[in-house]
């Protein structure tokens, strides 16, 4: 389910895997979210997530409420890349930089920016909240 209310996008997700990142003390969390594949970098010392956990992702222009059980950061939408070489349509990769930590949103159907009404260089908050 993808909800979009006043520049706030809410995705229901399940964590598929947590992999070692390419830098020391960095992990990459991979999730399936309502037709999107979302991955984000997280520093090992603040990683509070586990595989198969159900979470909610919020991408918002306004600072959302959060608790110590959530991961939240803010940064900018850097780019959206389109790969038309796939046999079954277009693949879009949207990249958000949280001042160094990266968030990648991959869609095999349509542009995430177009469906969410966001633009490159928009300042956004990215939160991953545990379903309690």
Curated annotation (Swiss-Prot):
<keyword id="KW-0804">Transcription</keyword>
<keyword id="KW-0808">Transferase</keyword>
<dbReference type="GO" id="GO:0006351">
    <property type="term" value="P:DNA-templated transcription"/>
</dbReference>
<dbReference type="InterPro" id="IPR012340">
    <property type="entry name" value="NA-bd_OB-fold"/>
</dbReference>
<keyword id="KW-0240">DNA-directed RNA polymerase</keyword>
<comment type="function">
    <text>DNA-dependent RNA polymerase (RNAP) catalyzes the transcription of DNA into RNA using the four ribonucleoside triphosphates as substrates.</text>
</comment>
<dbReference type="GO" id="GO:0003899">
    <property type="term" value="F:DNA-directed RNA polymerase activity"/>
</dbReference>
<keyword id="KW-0963">Cytoplasm</keyword>
<protein>
    <recommendedName>
        <fullName>DNA-directed RNA polymerase subunit Rpo8</fullName>
        <ecNumber>2.7.7.6</ecNumber>
    </recommendedName>
</protein>
<comment type="similarity">
    <text>Belongs to the archaeal Rpo8 RNA polymerase subunit family.</text>
</comment>
<keyword id="KW-0548">Nucleotidyltransferase</keyword>
<dbReference type="GO" id="GO:0005737">
    <property type="term" value="C:cytoplasm"/>
</dbReference>
<dbReference type="Pfam" id="PF16992">
    <property type="entry name" value="RNA_pol_RpbG"/>
</dbReference>
<dbReference type="GO" id="GO:0000428">
    <property type="term" value="C:DNA-directed RNA polymerase complex"/>
</dbReference>
<dbReference type="InterPro" id="IPR031555">
    <property type="entry name" value="RNA_pol_Rpo8"/>
</dbReference>
<comment type="subunit">
    <text>Part of the 13-subunit RNA polymerase complex.</text>
</comment>
């Amino acid at each position: 389910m993808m909800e979009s209310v006043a520049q706030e996008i809410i995705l229901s997700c399940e964590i598929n895997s947590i992999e070692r990142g390419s830098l020391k003390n960095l992990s990459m969390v991979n999730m399936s979210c309502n037709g999107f594949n979302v991955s984000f970098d997280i520093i090992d010392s603040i990683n509070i997530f586990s595989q198969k956990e159900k979470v909610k992702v919020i991408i918002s222009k306004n600072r959302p409420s959060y608790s110590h059980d959530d991961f939240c950061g803010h940064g900018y939408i850097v780019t959206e890349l389109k790969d038309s070489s796939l046999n079954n349509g277009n693949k879009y990769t949207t990249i958000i930089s949280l001042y160094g930590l990266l968030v990648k949103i991959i869609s095999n159907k349509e542009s995430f920016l177009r469906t969410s009404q966001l633009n490159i260089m928009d300042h956004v908050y990215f939160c991953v909240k545990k379903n309690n």
